[in-house]
Amino acid sequence: SLSGDVFTNCMAIFLISYILNLIYTCRHLKVVDYIIIGMVSCCVAVSKIVYLPLCALIFIIPKECFYSKKFSNILKKRIVVLIIFLCSVVIGVIWLKISSGFLTSASPSSELQVKYILNHPILYFVTVLRTVSIEFNNWSLDMVGGFMQWGQMFTLYPIISISVYFIFFMSLLVEENDVKLSKSSKLLIFLIFFITFILILTALYVQWTAKAGEIGGNLITGIQGRYFTPIFLLIPIILPSLVTSTDKKINRNVILYSIILLQIPTLLSIVVNNIN
């Protein structure tokens, strides 16, 4: 698919993966690294403003990556990182202002919904909890499957369930976590996850729920599981690995290829559906 959500998810996942790779290899940042991180961060911020907090992941890059014999050079590199983040924020906000007038879901009732949230934060928090408790299972399944072909097809539940299980198993039980992060970095990642999660829910509450005429509605509508795919990847980073270096490890590729093979029936169904 070449839809906007796919592009946005790819950019967000690439940003997370690239930064984690820098941490894992612990290599010194080069000019090309700053360029790549800056460009991808701006793409993420422009694609969906709710993913803007992901750009703050740049701050978990350890000081070893900024090593230099001169303290002034280290300071300059830190300043460049801060500038990249600020540019992403500014560009994202500017584009939001420009594009907001072209949103098909824009509605005068959106302002009323924003006022409701500001005037009744506790009630809105209850609405968030209620929505999560009701829709959590659907979101979990929708992250790795769900409706396709404009609602004409749906991934088989066994395939979705097994895929979700394999992903968690591969993340937490297969091998020791290679990326070591400090407590402050994990706290920052958690805050990024939480803020992004709330922004996703709030954006849909202001746009889709308000558009349906439900000012102060009890449930948030219009949320799809794929919106959480990028931040879903942050969870295994925060959680401790459930294996130690002495445990017998399972080849991660075995599970990875199993997940890919599970998608073959879905791909065949799409082909057959398009042929007919």
Task: Show where each model-derived region lies.
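Short acidic/glycine- and proline-prone juxtamembrane loop motifs at membrane-interface regions
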Residues: 1-8
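Hydrophobic core segments of transmembrane alpha-helices in multi-pass, intramembrane catalytic enzymes
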Residues: 8-16, 229-233
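Perimembrane helix-loop-helix junctions
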Residues: 21-28, 53-86
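Membrane-interface alpha helices of multi-pass inner-membrane proteins
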Residues: 33-49, 54-60
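Hydrophobic alpha-helical membrane-interfacial segments at the cytosolic entry of transmembrane helices
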Residues: 35-41, 70-97, 187-195, 257-262
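Membrane-lumen/periplasm interface segments of multi-pass, membrane-embedded glycan/lipid transferases
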Residues: 92-176
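Transmembrane helical bundles and short interhelical boundary loops of multi-pass, membrane-embedded
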Residues: 94-98, 248-276
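Transmembrane alpha-helix segments characteristic
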Residues: 180-213
